[in-house]
């Protein structure tokens, strides 16, 4: 069990997802590390910890990349971070329950870059849909699939 760990890119992670992760860490006695540039409220637990990094662009992301191992799972909505995690042989799951994979990450990066270019040229592209109960359930289901293998 000690080889497995869950990292959370916690600054933008929705609170309902953190709650699911807190329960999973306790249930499976699995290390859960939340990395953020601000203090994150966590329950008292020998399995749950947080790392507060300095302010700055992608500082939390770099911390996770520097410490992740192939048996780890990273929770992030940050597609470039997910790509780096996959390169290191670990798994990345977004808060809506979608697993980033070698097969889909390039397409996601391309779409992200395209949308960024559109926004940069003044086109209003809108944002993602509001986080929903269905997203929460999809995340819980995807996390459970990973936990079964642990």
Curated annotation (Swiss-Prot):
Bilayer-crossing regions: none
Pfam families, per the entry: DUF188
Top-level taxonomic group: Bacteria
InterPro entries tied to this protein: UPF0178 (IPR003791)
Protein family according to the UniProt entry: Belongs to the UPF0178 family.
Protein name as it appears in the record: UPF0178 protein Sbal223_2514
């Amino acid at each position: 069990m000690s080889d497995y760990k869950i990292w959370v890119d916690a600054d933008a992670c929705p609170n309902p997802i953190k709650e699911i992760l807190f329960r999973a860490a306790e249930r499976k006695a699995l290390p859960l590390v939340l990395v953020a540039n601000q203090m994150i409220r966590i329950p008292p637990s020998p399995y749950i910890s947080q790392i507060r990094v300095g302010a700055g662009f992608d500082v939390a992301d770099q911390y996770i990349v520097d410490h992740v191992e192939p048996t780890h799972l990273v929770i992030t909505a940050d597609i470039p971070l997910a790509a780096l995690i996959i390169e290191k042989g670990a798994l990345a799951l977004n808060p809506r329950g979608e697993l980033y994979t070698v097969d889909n990450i390039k397409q996601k990066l391309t779409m992200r870059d395209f949308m960024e270019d559109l926004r940069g040229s003044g086109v209003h592209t809108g944002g993602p849909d509001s986080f929903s109960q269905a997203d929460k359930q999809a995340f819980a289901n995807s996390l459970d699939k990973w936990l079964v293998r642990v």
